[in-house]
Amino acid sequence: MITHPQFDPVLISIGPLAVRWYALSYILGFILFTFLGRRRIAQGLSVFTKESLDDFLTWGILGVILGGRLGYVLFYKFSDYLAHPLDIFKVWEGGMSFHGGFLGVVIAIRLFGRKHGIGFLKLMDTVAPLVPLGLASGRIGNFINGELWGRVTDINAFWAMGFPQARYEDAEAAAHNPLWAEWLQQYGMLPRHPSQLYQFALEGICLFTVIWLFSKKQRSTGQVASLFLGGYGIFRFIAEFARQPDDYLGLLTLGLSMGQWLSVPMIVLGIVGFVRFGMKKQH
């Protein structure tokens, strides 16, 4: 079993100011978005100009941050924040939701499109290929922080990793499993899936490769966005089987996690949209 490297979450500290790796992962994501967006403009595969791309980035950042935070509040810890509403603003304590951030960006796309006279689906198609590498960057940030670890796996598995931050969860899990209790006593940690890296590979690298290659040719309006929607939903659904469910929610109906249930409508809408828009092209 490998032990998580235990990176210092703070990259640079100057007096009271601290630059954290997780914040840097978001910044890197936005930089990659801009770089890829300009490349698509040069290739003639974008509805953006260089100026409008920079303008949209501001809208997108607001959508990601506000949507991600509100999504986490509503989807994951609503009762806690209802009792302590001021905690909503304590973003430095963590708590962001991809699905909330996605909805925030969709709203930003809608508003931006109306302002600039760009069709909603065309703008969605343009934005979709620019997103996955940012998601990959965010998952690396999660890994550096040693958060969002995976479920318990076999002690002899080559991918098994111990997370010191999970000791409370390890003790709770071992209390219900004699074998895990032996492992915990012997190694001080339970072997877990490094699910952040799985999500980095699936939702980041694989999704980017599929969408980037697919969108290099002219496609029916809405197909690229649908591929992103369904592709992310499928990859997230798969990765969630290795990811530790949120301790305050656990597994829900049919033994699925909140992340999986939130991904189901993405999968359905993505598949339906991909087929429907593809049929329009054929006619």
Curated annotation (Swiss-Prot):
GO cellular component, one term: plasma membrane
Keywords assigned: Cell inner membrane, Cell membrane, Membrane, Transferase, Transmembrane, Transmembrane helix
InterPro entries from the UniProt entry: Lgt
Source domain of life: Bacteria
GO molecular function: phosphatidylglycerol-prolipoprotein diacylglyceryl transferase activity
Annotated residues for binding of a 1,2-diacyl-sn-glycero-3-phospho-(1'-sn-glycerol): 139
Record's keyword annotation contains Transferase: yes
GO BP term, example: lipoprotein biosynthetic process
Record-linked NCBIfam families: lgt (TIGR00544)
Function: Catalyzes the transfer of the diacylglyceryl group from phosphatidylglycerol to the sulfhydryl group of the N-terminal cysteine of a prolipoprotein, the first step in the formation of mature lipoproteins.
Protein name according to UniProt: Phosphatidylglycerol--prolipoprotein diacylglyceryl transferase
Organism per entry: Neisseria meningitidis serogroup B (strain ATCC BAA-335 / MC58)
Phylogenetic lineage: Bacteria, Pseudomonadati, Pseudomonadota, Betaproteobacteria, Neisseriales
